[in-house]
Amino acid sequence: MKTLATSAALALGTLLFAPSAHAAAMPLGNYQLLTNRYTTHAWTWAINLCQPDCVDVTATPRPVRMGVEFFGSAHLAGSTYTLVNDAPDGVICWGYTLPAHDVYSWDAVSLAGTVESTFDAGCNGSPGGVNTWTFALERM
């Protein structure tokens, strides 16, 4: 009888405290976005939980006057997070900016990824296109 009770307790403990399927989720906190995209400013991302397969991102430019803060939810599929942002300042031209549709994708463990930026028009009337940059998130 004692063996049965012990086995039941161990089984219950295994169910309650087993690693979840979300073990690949990134740690919450503040990160510096390291990228080859920007030369005029840097970004800080505050990462908070929004649901089991999602994190909320508050992206703040540094210095603040050099970019437009944005908010979004990054969804986890497998081990990859994806965040979509329609950036009013996604294309930086000499003296002005143009909008772009940015898709950030990064690995939940290595925190390295790419941002693909699609834009309808380029600087000085040049045609639209797609640019891809690499980035990494470094915990602050």
Enumerate the language-model features and the residues they cover.
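Short, surface-exposed loop and linker segments with low hydrophobicity and enrichment for Pro/Ser/Thr
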Residues: A18-P27, G95-Y96, H101-S110
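Internal, hydrophobic beta-strand segments that form the core of beta-sheet-rich folds
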Residues: H101-A121, L137
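N-terminal start-of-chain detector that recognizes signal peptides
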Residues: L4, H75, D107-L111
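Central antiparallel beta-sheet cores of small beta-barrel/beta-sandwich binding domains
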Residues: A25-P27, Q32-P99, G125-M140
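Generic marker of "main functional regions" within proteins
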Residues: A11-T14, H41, V103
